[in-house]
């Protein structure tokens, strides 16, 4: 099994080109292809998962809605939210889907604890919560034993668009963000801590930064 996990720092990019690129990456990867994690912020967009229902889109307004191929219901992405797309050969890693979700949740819980923010997962509602308010969302797709999509952590963003939807299909679900609990946040530092936690919880020995585009 590879010992180094590669990360691509994409900055801010529109949702659909990144989604299309991760589909291509997953469809074309061979059995020896190294795993990658793509870190990105998106301009405002609602994404509707495969289980999504139209009634959970309350008032999208001027924010585009994209129907996507991950699990779960509707969520919102916007600037100030750290999104990590996990392009992993989970069969090679020996992870089941529930195991991978648990690892992602523990990764986020430990990251938040490093800022002094106690968080927890819920057995019936994937994601990570602080005092009952959701701070991170998870959504995955597994194809040919490989994962894509991933997690979204609210760092320091405008949470108002979440009021235009029932987040993850839950009416009235409160949303929160790291900056509300830990004060001023350096986004790059959150990204660095997330990288370290992913390496740890995905059982890698080290990490590297990958260069080049995703086209």
From Swiss-Prot:
Gene name of this polypeptide: lipB
Family membership noted in the UniProt record: Belongs to the LipB family.
Site description Lowers pKa of active site Cys, residues in chain: 134
Positions of the catalytic residues: 168
Main location: cytoplasm
NCBIfam families linked: lipB, PRK14342.1
Additional facts recorded: In the reaction, the free carboxyl group of octanoic acid is attached via an amide linkage to the epsilon-amino group of a specific lysine residue of lipoyl domains of lipoate-dependent enzymes.
Name of this chain's protein: Octanoyltransferase
Compartments where found: Cytoplasm
Domain BPL/LPL catalytic: 31-206
KW NAD (keyword) present: no
HAMAP family: LipB
GO cellular component: cytoplasm
GO biological process: protein modification process
Keywords: Acyltransferase, Cytoplasm, Transferase
EC number(s) on file: 2.3.1.181
Reaction(s) this enzyme catalyzes, per UniProt: octanoyl-[ACP] + L-lysyl-[protein] = N(6)-octanoyl-L-lysyl-[protein] + holo-[ACP] + H(+)
Residue sites binding substrate per the record: 70-77, 137-139, 150-152
Function summary: Catalyzes the transfer of endogenously produced octanoic acid from octanoyl-acyl-carrier-protein onto the lipoyl domains of lipoate-dependent enzymes. Lipoyl-ACP can also act as a substrate although octanoyl-ACP is likely to be the physiological substrate.
């Amino acid at each position: 099994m590879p010992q180094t996990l590669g990360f691509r720092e994409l900055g801010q990019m529109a949702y659909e080109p990144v989604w299309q690129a991760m589909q291509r990456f997953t469809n074309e990867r061979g059995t020896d292809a190294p795993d990658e994690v793509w870190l990105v912020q998106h301009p405002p967009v609602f994404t509707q998962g495969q289980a999504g229902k139209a009634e959970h889109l309350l008032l999208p307004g001027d924010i585009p809605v994209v129907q996507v191929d991950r699990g779960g219901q509707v969520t919102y992405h916007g600037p100030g939210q750290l999104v990590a797309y996990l392009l992993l050969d989970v069969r090679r890693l020996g992870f089941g889907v529930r195991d991978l979700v648990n690892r992602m949740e523990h990764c986020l819980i430990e990251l938040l604890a490093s800022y002094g923010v106690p968080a927890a997962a819920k057995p019936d509602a994937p994601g990570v919560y602080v005092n009952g308010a959701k701070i991170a969302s998870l959504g995955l797709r597994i194809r040919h034993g490989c994962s894509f999509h991933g997690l979204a952590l609210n760092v320091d963003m405008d949470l108002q668009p979440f009021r235009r939807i029932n987040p993850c299909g839950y009416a009235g679900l409160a949303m929160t963000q790291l900056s509300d609990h830990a004060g001023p946040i350096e986004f790059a530092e959150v990204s660095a801590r997330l990288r370290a936690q992913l390496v740890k919880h995905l059982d890698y020995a080290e990490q590297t930064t990958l260069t080049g585009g995703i086209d």
